[in-house]
Amino acid sequence: MVTRHVLAAALAGSMTSAQRLHPTSQRASDDLIQNLPGLDPAAKVTQHAGRIALHDNDKNKMFYWHFQAAQDPEKAPLVIWLNGGPGCTSMQGLFLGNSPFTLKDDSTIGKNEHSWHEFANLLFVDQPIGTGMSYTKGNDYRLDEETIAQDFYEFLTKFLQRHNKYLSDGDDGVSNSRAVYMFGESHAGRWIPEFSDHIMKQNNDPKNQIKINLDGVGIGNGWVHPRIQYEYSDYAHGLGLLTFGQVRSLKASYAECLAALDAGTYYSRSCLDNMDSITGSVKPGNGGNSLNFYDVRQYLRNVGSYPSGQSNIAKYMNKMEVRKAVHGNEDKNFRFDLCSNGVFRALSKFDGVSTLDKVESLLQQGLRMIFYNGQWDMMCNHYGTEKLLLNLNWNGSDAYQQADKYTWRVQGRKEPAGFAQQGGNLTYLVVTGAGHMVPMDVPDVAADILRRFVNRLEFNDKVQTVVTTRLNATDMEVSFCYSPSVSADPDTSLSTRDQTGANSSQVHIGIAWLWVALVIAVVSSVLAVCVTIVCIRNKRNGKQEHEMITQVSDDEEVNQIEDESEEGFSDEDVGVHVLVSNVSQRATSPRSRVTEV
């Protein structure tokens, strides 16, 4: 999501009402890119770009860039790519891993050897209006996601009408689209469920003349369920950034965030403090670099500069000859920004709203969904994604939760491409060697993800030997575990399942013997008291003079036994007491400074 926490402080250059609009084109041929600055003229890429007016006026226009598939374009599916933010241009996805193009500098286009257009038609969209090259007159930004979903649906139907090769005649005069897929990252974890839900509802409306065949969606490092994803301490602890005590401290303070979300406050300082506390704690002294929460393998002077290639995108798209070539905004006062501060501010109140219910509904309706996470991204990390998926309840839940986990490889790589769990119509991947932006970090792996998904191929290269036990979300809260005993002899060592079973048996046996010992101790004590009483009475009867006898009552003896039991089996023996230590906090929240890519 590059900017989910970092909406660059200097996002300036808002559009004015004086902007000159490029004449609206109604045919695909009008949007054909003839000569793209910086591209080798010998490059064989068929591409279109332009803007489509919403609501049949020039007030709001949405920009797109389309690439025809290199192979069998008349049958290949249409794959839509959406960046996040909210308010970040999809030109980031275009130039940083997905399209046929990369930028060598701010003027020269290179070739992406792992372009998705090799097997799919690609469509990159700048949305909501006011994002990237998309236009809104008078900075009339959308204030709710329902309106944004309506805008996107209108854009998509008009795009299909303009590029009518994607439509075929169906029954009762309804036009059916070719297979359509939506992929995106970061805040697209909100866009894609919202847009998919709207498309499905419109498909069921008999008044609509176009039915969009949404065949599947993919969400990379997505921001889906903030109630879980605002909490970063478990992921940070796994990296060695925090101690158990610091995790306990952060989880205690996280209750304020949950209270804010429950109260309907979806953009709360208390929710941003969790990440700030971690990054502030691990940062070295004054002048030191900061942890890049989009890729924890890096420490950067300015996290807002991530990814490093983004500055070339802004410079390239701001060249007038480029704007003319892509049929964009030709007003000399217009400035193309990677992320729109205005769009972000208008929608910031939705930052803590969950789309998990829509994900669940879409799965229940049979929509194929794939979630994938770069393992080194902390902002939208794999721990949070795996946990939120355990909160889903649909007709494929059992199949997904009980599914084996697989290691999958990509041709040309000896190391794993990632790890997969797939059941029902849901697939979840953890991608090795990648941070927040998987297509940028491992473009060959990202291309393989899309290729397998659109061709309905599984990620089942090698099943993992560790047995899968069905879990639910509450199981993820367990803080302590037992270490199984493993024989040093490989011939007599236990399997993972056997080790777990043996360890569990040892625990149960130990508890049983503990109870036996307690019962024996109580019985022995009672017998001893009785014997003592009998002896004293016999002795008293045998003496001529009266003697004073001090006795310990049964109640006192039992209380003493219980006190001894408590001393023998303290809380430290039953559970682990973790001292809570404070985590230093910094006031500046990454999320308040940037959104995402």
UniProtKB/Swiss-Prot annotation:
Spans within the Cytoplasmic topological domain: 530-597
Catalytic reaction list: Preferential release of a C-terminal arginine or lysine residue
One protein family per Pfam: Peptidase_S10
GO molecular function: serine-type carboxypeptidase activity
Subcellular compartments: Golgi apparatus, trans-Golgi network membrane
Keyword set includes tRNA processing: no
Main location: Golgi
InterPro entries, A to Z: AB_hydrolase_fold (IPR029058), Peptidase_S10 (IPR001563), Ser_caboxypep_his_AS (IPR033124)
Function: Protease with a carboxypeptidase B-like function involved in the C-terminal processing of the lysine and arginine residues from protein precursors. Promotes cell fusion and is involved in the programmed cell death.
Family: Belongs to the peptidase S10 family.
Name of the protein described by the UniProt record: Pheromone-processing carboxypeptidase KEX1
Source species of the chain: Phytophthora infestans (strain T30-4)
The organism's taxonomic lineage, starting at the top: Eukaryota, Sar, Stramenopiles, Oomycota, Peronosporales
